[in-house]
């Protein structure tokens, strides 16, 4: 073919590709922004990405790399440190907030920003309950929060958590072979939350539930594509099995509701069955089951990952490990000879361990943001947030911001010495009216686990140079394959 003809044709083809891709990149902008009229002029900076996908490919690419925070850094580098950006993420037009001020604004303003969840979350956690009115949600939240909060409730669980931790560590320290440490932490946390939800535990029941929850979690972090082979499809099947199992548990509890139970045997499920509104109306079973699913889910993920990362970070810093261990030894020395086991008062004396836990939760923040939705047209620092758009509170963006935390990639518990936390700068459990009700219980589990681990065990990693994977959650790519070795 004549080269004089070939080159112009190639140039036309490449030019057509550029025009086509440019057109595709503008579709989301035209569809979501163009319809806003004058309001579009006061939107925050940012771009809407590709049709349907939005900017999800850029987000996933960042979290599959060794620098997951590059996604937010790119926004800051490109548009300046506004703390608020427009985007299209998790299949919806979005406003990203990632500074303490903007995060606090969204989390605290319940009048303008309500709960917002991706469609996959609504389907898997229960549309009827996730979509309840604010007043109804407050009433149910009060019922489900009571078993988790306050010194009286926490004191009741110390001994139980202790027993589980001691038994689990004893078993792991005896088998003399590597275990998947993250999975063991999940089993521990699930057993604890299972006791609180059901009052008593059946190992078989909890093992079955944990299996279903593994599939459910994968679906929560995936697009809502209900086709065999996709994670969401498997998660829907797991939810059906979980609902069936919980229906059986509910029926069994109803049958024995007339039989007097010991106070220590009552769980959240019993409180929900007994609950009545001002008109004497009881909760429907569908709402009870959804609430149980939500609380079982929220109650075990955070503590499992934080416990694992605390051990890993301390392993990487022997001087910090020794300091944390010495603090636990001092607590034992001060203990009366007649006392057996930990008390809540002793846990409150673990000043250095508290800093280790806070730093662990900051450093190992999840990539999933906190989802909110604008109830009305709102304003954040002079920028318009259109009604119906989702607002993503980017906790990791705050926790890893060098202007908020010096050298944020370093694990440094001493940064919490005499530290005054600026509102919105430390939000591992969210904030405002929707703050995680199980935050105190999560920390209690971590304290008790680390107390016994530091005193009596060490971790021998099988792959010390194992890279970190950030999807779906930050973890060693081998899920922390290690031997638990008894040293005490």
Curated annotation (Swiss-Prot):
Checking Pfam families in the record gives: p450
Cofactor(s) required, per the database record: heme
Q: Give the metabolic or biological pathway.
A: Secondary metabolite biosynthesis; terpenoid biosynthesis
**InterPro entries tied to this protein:** Cyt_P450, Cyt_P450_E_grp-I, Cyt_P450_sf
Q: Which gene encodes it?
A: CYP88A51
GO cellular component terms attached to this protein's record: endoplasmic reticulum; membrane
Distribution of this protein across tissues and organs: Accumulates in mature fruits and in juice vesicles.
Example GO BP: pollen tube development
Where is heme annotated to bind?
A: 436
SUPFAM superfamilies in the cross-refs = Cytochrome P450
**Domain of life here?**
Eukaryota
* A GO term, aspect molecular function: heme binding
Enzyme class, broadest EC rank:
oxidoreductase
Reaction catalysed by this enzyme: melianol + reduced [NADPH--hemoprotein reductase] + O2 = 7,8-epoxymelianol + oxidized [NADPH--hemoprotein reductase] + H2O + H(+)
Entry-linked PANTHER family: CYTOCHROME P450 26, CYTOCHROME P450 88D6
* EC number(s) from the headed UniProt entry: 1.14.14.-
Q: Does the keyword Heme apply?
A: yes
Q: What is this protein called?
A: 7,8-epoxymelianol synthase CYP88A51
TM segment ranges: 4-24
Similarity-based family = Belongs to the cytochrome P450 family.
Which key words tag this protein in UniProt? Heme, Iron, Membrane, Metal-binding, Monooxygenase, Oxidoreductase, Transmembrane, Transmembrane helix
Q: How does it sit in the membrane?
A: Single-pass membrane protein
